[in-house]
A protein has these predicted regions:
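Generic hydrophobic alpha-helical segments
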Residues: 8-9, 208
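Ser/Thr- (and often Asn-) enriched beta-sheet segments in non-cytosolic proteins
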Residues: 8, 31-35, 125
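Sequence/fold signature of self-assembling virion shell proteins
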Residues: 96, 101-225
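Short, glycine/acidic-rich hinge or "gate" loops at secondary-structure transitions
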Residues: 11-28
Length: 225
């Protein structure tokens, strides 16, 4: 399990940075935190909770787009959210009436139809991420929280940097140890012990994403006003 956790650690960090503006992870009895300095006014609640069919979802998204454009000169063109939030879109009165004009909002709304409408109306391409992972405590967590809607520009938002672990630098030359690099930057070290006789296994990784575009991202908590 430890190796699986290490293999997804960099992905967890990237999604934390994108959806919260910071990283907070636990490991080896320590808490690792890093704040990317995202402007506080680029993290906001909504005018009315989006679960309310009368919420002004389109206006909220336009407000966020205008804010990022005004502050940075960059247009946000992508968004990531959950199926829960897409369900709010599906029930939203304004969105339904805008799509089903001839039937006064009556009709079935698929995710594909909603995505196309938002793309045509606001030039925002929506991605749904409902993927989950098991954290260090064994609890199942989401990469993207249920009630989060994150807007960001096209292109590369940053990159992940990998460092050399102590096992790679110090133990690879020792006959008593066997170090293998798996996935990206994950060092799996096995060492034979004589007293008592056993094999000790360590799984280590050193990595940190950078996020130079943090000020070009807008995060909505859609369940709070």
């Amino acid at each position: 399990r430890r190796q699986r956790q290490m293999c997804i650690r960099d992905r967890r960090m990237r999604m934390m940075a994108l959806t919260t503006g910071a990283i907070a992870m636990e490991g080896n009895g320590q808490v690792y935190e890093y704040d990317y300095g995202m402007p506080e006014d680029h993290k906001s609640n909504v005018t009315k909770v989006w679960s309310d069919p009368s919420a002004s979802i389109l206006t909220d998204i336009r407000t966020a787009k205008d804010k990022i454009l005004e502050d940075t000169g960059v247009e946000v063109t992508r968004a990531v959210t959950s199926s829960t939030v897409m369900g709010y879109f599906r029930k939203n009165t304004e969105i339904k009436k805008s799509i089903f004009v001839l039937t006064d909002g009556e009709g079935f709304l698929s995710d594909a139809k909603i995505k196309q409408f938002i793309l045509d109306e606001l030039n925002i391409e929506i991605a749904i991420n409902d993927k989950k992972y098991v954290d260090e405590s064994g609890a199942v967590q989401r990469y993207v929280d249920d009630d989060v809607f994150v807007l960001f520009p096209s292109g590369n938002l940053g990159q992940t940097w990998f460092g050399t672990t102590p096992e790679e630098s110090d133990l690879m030359s020792l006959a008593a140890s066997n170090v293998k690099i798996t996935d990206t930057g994950v060092a799996v070290t096995t060492m034979a012990k004589e007293d008592p006789v056993n094999v000790e296994t360590k799984v280590t990784q050193i990595c940190l994403p950078d996020f130079p575009t943090a000020d070009q991202v807008f995060i909505y908590s859609v369940d709070q006003v």
